[in-house]
UniProtKB/Swiss-Prot annotation:
Function description: Catalyzes the transfer of the diacylglyceryl group from phosphatidylglycerol to the sulfhydryl group of the N-terminal cysteine of a prolipoprotein, the first step in the formation of mature lipoproteins.
GO cellular component: plasma membrane
Molecular function in Gene Ontology: phosphatidylglycerol-prolipoprotein diacylglyceryl transferase activity
Annotated metabolic or biological route of this protein: Protein modification; lipoprotein biosynthesis (diacylglyceryl transfer)
HAMAP family: Lgt
NCBIfam families to which the protein is assigned, alphabetical: lgt
Composition skew (Acidic residues), residue ranges: 314-324
Originating organism: Streptomyces coelicolor (strain ATCC BAA-471 / A3(2) / M145)
Main location: membrane
Localisation: Cell membrane
Name recorded for this polypeptide: Phosphatidylglycerol--prolipoprotein diacylglyceryl transferase 1
BP GO terms, sorted: lipoprotein biosynthetic process
Region (Disordered): 269-343
Length: 343
């Protein structure tokens, strides 16, 4: 008998009046907001403009959702196109079913389009948003908890998740919460990328490649624990092979990129340059205007000093002329007196 377990929600949908709020969709939305928030902070710290990450996310997120859904439907086509299934269910994304591989691939295409429109380098943008994507995955995985899906093998561990209703016909009970394992792993991946980026100044897409490699390593062993139906190739689940292949590509990219383009590239946005130039021009104009005002004020002070000096010197000259006239008069009087004595 289980002493403790993680209870599953009694329902995955809450109704706010006439509006249904599905737990799966809510987790995805929260994850997107967290990814954009963290990505924006990292982008600005690298020299980019605020708002660029959100603008590019407008392209990346829809592409990612479409790609994730396509990957899920293609790899699990029997759930929608086999006998007795309704193919319309393939469009019901709110009921769950997103493949992270398709989401990352198509999301990268959308981000590339958005980055080109903004004139920013795609590798630098990918490095900035990498840990945010990992956190978004950590939050999004809790959507599986709301839908009671993608759990692992049966277990009586204290942290087992209780499954009360199963759509695949399995017996209700307690199972490994693989959604929780992957959520915690993704948080660790985000912290790893942030630390490595600060420690080694990762650039040219290497921070994003590190995120991909680290996620694939965790996904490989977590995939072994899942019991949901999946295609197998040579004894391994399809997602195991995908994780292994993508992991090798990411590691190869890190090695080759570090050799060819070491260090971190400078982020220069066209809009950021213009804004900086406008600020510089305004500052130059202010300085120039201040200097002109000071020169004009100095000229006025000089004119006032000249006038005052002239006014001061004029009385001195007049006084000198008066003294000369008085001396001549005194001399005349003296000469007259002498003449009178002689006579």
């Amino acid at each position: 008998m289980e002493l403790a377990f993680i209870p599953s929600p009694s329902r995955g949908v809450l109704h706010l009046g006439p509006v249904p709020l599905r737990g799966y969709a809510f987790c995805i939305i929260i994850g997107v907001f967290v990814a954009v928030w963290l990505g924006n902070k990292r982008w600005v710290a690298r020299g980019g403009r605020p708002g660029t990450v959100a603008d590019i996310a407008v392209w990346a997120v829809p592409f990612g959702l479409i790609g994730g859904r396509l990957y899920h439907v293609i790899t699990d086509y029997q759930l929608y196109f086999s006998e007795g299934r309704d193919w319309v269910d393939a469009f019901k994304i709110w009921e769950g079913g997103l493949g992270i591989w398709g989401a990352i691939a198509f999301g990268a295409v959308g981000a590339w389009i958005g980055a080109r429109r903004r004139g920013v380098p795609m590798p630098a943008y990918a490095d900035a948003v990498a840990p945010g994507i990992a956190l978004a995955q950590a939050i999004g995985r809790w959507g599986n908890w709301f839908n009671q899906e993608l759990y692992g093998k049966a277990t009586d561990l204290p942290w087992a998740v209780e499954i009360t209703s199963t759509a695949d016909g399995r017996v209700p009970g307690t199972y490994h919460p693989t959604f929780l394992y992957e959520s915690l792993w993704c948080i660790g991946v985000a912290l790893l990328v942030i630390w490595a980026d600060r420690r080694f100044k990762l650039g040219h897409g290497r921070a994003f490649a590190l995120y991909v490699a680290a996620y694939c390593a965790g996904r490989f062993w977590i995939e072994y624990m899942r019991v949901d139906d999946a295609h197998h190739i040579l004894g391994l689940r399809l997602n195991n092979w995908t994780a292994l292949f993508v992991f090798l590509l990411a590691v190869l990219y890190i090695v080759l990129s570090a050799r060819k383009r070491p260090g971190r590239e400078a982020v220069v946005e066209p809009g950021a340059e213009t804004a900086a130039g406008d600020s510089g021009s305004a500052a130059d104009k202010d300085v120039k205007g201040t200097k002109d005002a000071e020169d004009a004020e100095g000229a006025e002070d000089g004119a006032e000093k000249t006038d005052a000096s002239g006014a001061t010197e004029a009385p001195e000259d007049t006084s000198g002329a008066d003294e000369a006239d008085a001396a001549k008069d005194a001399e005349g009087v003296t000469n007259g007196a002498d003449s009178a004595k002689k006579g």
